[in-house]
Amino acid sequence: MKKLIAFIIAAMMIASALAACGKTDDQNKTKTTETTTETQKKEEPPKPVTLTPAEIEARIKAAIGEKNYICNTKIEEDSFASYYGFDMTQIKSFVALENAVGAVNPDTVIIMEVKDGYAQTAVNILNESFEGKVGYIRLYPFNVQKVLGARLFMEGNYVAFIIAGASYEGENTEEEAKLAAAEYAKIDNAWEAIFGKKPHNLAIIPEDKGNGGGGLFPSGDEDIPVIGG
């Protein structure tokens, strides 16, 4: 009788242990599945984009709004190539627009689709040009926060340089900065809607050395070349 009771107890203990193991296995499988799903979500590549630079520019314009989008002058290919120094054989297509009075309104939108391996070079060239724009507004402070908030994006073979949005009229620098931030948020959202991921701004603001842009421009009243100015 004692042996029978001992056998029953042992059987019950084994069954309980097996049930616990089964439950743990199920929990581990669930956790593994959840982890795998989360990893897959994180590693999902951005959705393929087939838009042309002109179509992307139209999305940016729509995000800003007709009233505040004042890039109304096309930069022709010859001027575009000579001013910026791009190798045009490496650019599949592009759109380049600015305001007709560039000396006062710095608004500029450049969208390019380049060939493989040229995107970073294009970014570097645009940053060199941006350094000049920053130097200019430090000498002649028009739309300072709009310029300092400029966007320079690179996604695959697409490169974009954007100074755009509503212009602040007043002398409150804090309010000017708030307006610029709000306008560029619209541009960031438009870019994210196109490419499926938050953009990373590659624009580099040069250090202010107190000499109007680090010696980029003379300190006198000499004319400063500005496209469209």
Describe the role of every protein-language-model region.
Residues M13, K23-T24:
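N-terminal targeting and processing segments of secreted/endomembrane and organelle-targeted proteins
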Residues S16-A20:
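C-terminal motif of bacterial Sec signal peptides marking the signal peptidase cleavage site
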Residues T24-G229:
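Mature, Sec-exported extracytoplasmic domains of Gram-positive
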Residues M1-L4, I8-I9:
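Positively charged n-region of N-terminal signal peptides that target proteins for export
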